[in-house]
Amino acid sequence: NLLSEEGLNVIGLPKTIDNDLWGTDMTFGFQSAVDIATQTIDCIHTTAASHNRIFIVEIMGHKVGWITLHAGIAGGADVILLPEIPYDIDKVYKAIDKRTKDNKGFTIVAVAEGAIPKEIAELPKKKRKEAIANNPYPSVAYELADKLKAYTTQDIRIAIPGHTQRGGSPDAYDLSLIHISEPTRHS
């Protein structure tokens, strides 16, 4: 505000792959991250199908699940779990069991790294924070896999593309955003 009062035009260029900034249509890097996560899910289809496995693909998104949602839909995940909607392990298993009964043989679960089980989400805020901080699992994918083992003997594998979602070459959409914004940037 102070700069604009001095006659300087100021704009903000959002730099987060999470696409979680209010007032923006799309943040820089979001679509590239979605493409990488989608490719991961797509590549896993073959091995999941040929070995009748449950694959849990953990995707970036600690507080919001936009990358997981878009990649899960585009990549053809069978179950998508987001931080905004606490999951019920019974419902996750029922979706897997239905696929088994329908002779699908495999299931791909796309889960955002910030997804939490319903029973944790229902705790009072202080207890919820403690439960999350004291979680013995290295990540949500491992917790989910361990919980699903109580329901099934089907082989469960985990794939975590991790920081590859933040790196690499930007896709055409993100390159367009970069080039469109170029005249507004100063060195």
Indicate where each model-derived feature is located:
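Acidic/polar active-site rim loop that often engages polyanionic ligands
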Residues: L13-M26, A49-S50, A74-G75
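Single conserved hydrophobic/aromatic residue that forms the stacking wall/gate
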Residues: I178-S187
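Short glycine/threonine-rich loop-to-helix capping motif typified by GTGT followed
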Residues: A121-P124, G168-S176
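Short beta-alpha connecting loops at secondary-structure transitions
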Residues: N19-D25, K127-I132, G168-D171
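Accessory alpha-helical/coil subdomains and C-terminal extensions
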Residues: N9, F30-H51, E58-Q154
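Short, ordered loop/turn segments at secondary-structure junctions
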Residues: L8, L13-D20, E84-Y87, E113-I116, ...
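N-terminal glycine-rich phosphate/adenylate-binding segment common to multiple enzyme folds
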Residues: N1-G7
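A contiguous binding-surface segment within folded domains or other stable secondary-structure elements
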Residues: Q154-I160
